[in-house]
Amino acid sequence: MKIDLNKVAREIEVDNRIPLRNYYRIADNLLRQASIYREEKNVVDLYIMLLRYSSLISETIPFHRDYQASLPQERLGSRKRLRAVINELESLKPEFNQLVDKLNRVEDESRQDGSDLPVVSYSSDAVEWPPAHKASYSRPDINKPLPTSQPSWTYNNNLTSSSNRTQIDQQFQKLSFDFLPPNQATLSRHSFLGPNGLKRQMVAPKSEIKVQYPSNTDWGSADNSGLIEAGPSSSSASLNGDSQEVSTLNSVLSLDDGRWQRHSEAVNSQFISDATEDPFQFVGMKQPSPPPVLAQVHQELAQICPSKVADPRPGPAIPSLEGKEGSNSYQHLHVPVRIMDDFLRLARSNTERNLETCGVLAGSLKNRVFHITTLIIPKQESTSDSCQTLNEEEIFEVQDRLSLFPLGWIHTHPTQTCFMSSVDLHTHYSYQIMLPEAVAIVMAPTDESTPHGIFHLSDPSGVSVIRNCQQRGFHPHEESEDGNPIYEHCSHVFLNAKLKYEVLDLR
């Protein structure tokens, strides 16, 4: 599909609830992605990451209320890197224009022929999962050779663009090195508190709405559809040394049933340093490209009464080609099949005491595909319906030391159903701001109909709702402006039976 720079590199609205340090971490992650794309000679994504970095440093971070008062070294360092980024953008601009023009010509020719460009997987041996709107699915023969595809610059967003050169020029015109302190009017426009700041009248939830977790009986029965597995896994050892039953891989791996393989092989990830002369000096990781399975989630869930719980029903997974105008184009994310069951075993003692457990998902990027390679169990405080991580800096230290991207989080609902509460949505908002591809995995072992789900905030609908919500604790949310669900099942996630990962328990 055509690349619209106004959307794939759009300005990020500042949220003063997010610490300024986290915004600089977002900038560092963008440069790390750019470093990987530079090494892989991926000019299109390299250009987009550099453009996002430029926008973040010049158009978002300076409007944070703590920008002038804190982190002076980060402020000076980011401005120095911005100069190098703009110089590289200028040098890449002609080649980027040529590649984009070529992509657009190919698409135009395809449309004239009356055919659509295929959805291309950026990993070899990928198994295409049927579109979410199809009512019935057929299971492939796992003994047949898996289809392969070569890396392509086809983007899976439903975007339209006029002149990409005009968009590029407009992006450059926005960039400036002279960051003057913003006046009060500017701050009020960019503040999540609105023009009235702290004086704004808080809107309390309606008194007749009672917010609580639903019981399992609130869910109606659903005809669960399964996932297509990528084929038998190679032999692997479990975390505790037990042998595996290969036959379980021949069952349907569904996010709506509980038949996951129980163990995983814990293997330390291999890392390499960027050998090229990179002014940003970030470390990339090399990972294998095993056969994935698209994490399609059944979408016909029985509706929960709105009086019982806030945001009870997620939206269905929307394939990229059917995405809404202005939505993000997410890069694929591979999740180890066994990581969910292993997490449940690690959380068993808390679950038996009706306490939630949470973990942080982190991993690598290779060939436009994110891979979850590390499950971090942080120090935490738990209740029956909440879980709070402690010592966030320790988590950041692990991610930085191992050069890992923050790819989301996972947590349990010991006795509740599988859904995202209002507290969960606010928690995931911080992850998705850090990286749009980040996911939230919910494990509900007592929910027989939907024991697990992989979700994220809809963008821009859900992200906007949570950004503008100033309430805390369990509360209902206003409906999004376009009427779309606040959160939805992920369409960019693949379950990978061969992906290896390690567990770091910091408790």
From Swiss-Prot:
KO phenotype (gene knockout): Seedling growth arrest phenotype. Impaired central lytic vacuole formation, autophagosomes accumulation, and mis-sorting of vacuolar protein cargo to the intercellular space as well as disturbed endocytosis.
Kindly give the membrane topology term recorded for this protein: Peripheral membrane protein
Locate the residues binding Zn(2+) 1.
Answer: H411, H413, D424
In its UniProt record, a GO molecular function of this protein is: metal-dependent deubiquitinase activity
Q: Where is this site: Indirect zinc-binding?
A: E356
Q: Which residues form a coiled coil?
A: 73-107
State the Pfam families in the record. JAB (PF01398), USP8_dimer (PF08969)
Reported cofactor(s): Zn(2+)
Keywords, A to Z, come to: Coiled coil, Cytoplasm, Endocytosis, Endosome, Hydrolase, Membrane, Metal-binding, Metalloprotease, Protease, Protein transport, Transport, Ubl conjugation pathway, Vacuole, Zinc
**EC number in record:** 3.4.19.-
Q: Name one GO cellular component term.
A: late endosome
Q: Which InterPro entries match?
A: JAMM/MPN+_dom (IPR000555), MPN (IPR037518), STAMBP/STALP-like_MPN (IPR044098), USP8_dimer (IPR015063)
Domain spans labelled MPN:
333-463
**Where, per UniProt, does this protein localize?**
Membrane; Cytoplasm; Vacuole membrane; Late endosome
Relay the cofactor remark from the entry.
Binds 2 Zn(2+) ions per subunit.
The highest taxon in the source lineage is Eukaryota
Q: What is its main location?
A: membrane
Q: Where is the composition biased (Polar residues)?
A: 146-162, 214-224, 232-242
* Chain spans, region Disordered: 133-162, 214-242
Q: Which GO terms describe its biological process?
A: endocytosis; intracellular transport; late endosome to vacuole transport via multivesicular body sorting pathway; positive regulation of intracellular protein transport; positive regulation of vacuole organization; protein K48-linked deubiquitination; protein K63-linked deubiquitination; protein transport
Role:
Zinc metalloprotease that cleaves 'Lys-48'- and 'Lys-63'-linked polyubiquitin chains, but is not implicated in protein degradation by the 26S proteasome, deneddylation, or desumoylation. Required for intracellular trafficking (e.g. trafficking from the Golgi to the vacuole and the vacuolar trafficking of endocytosed cargo), endocytosis and vacuole biogenesis.
Q: How does it assemble?
A: Interacts with PATL1 and PATL2. May also bind to HSC70-1, HSC70-3, VHA-A, BGLU23 and EPSIN1. Interacts with BRO1/ALIX.
- UniProt note: domains: The JAMM motif is essential for the protease activity.
What protein am I looking at?
Answer: AMSH-like ubiquitin thioesterase 3
Q: Which gene encodes it?
A: AMSH3
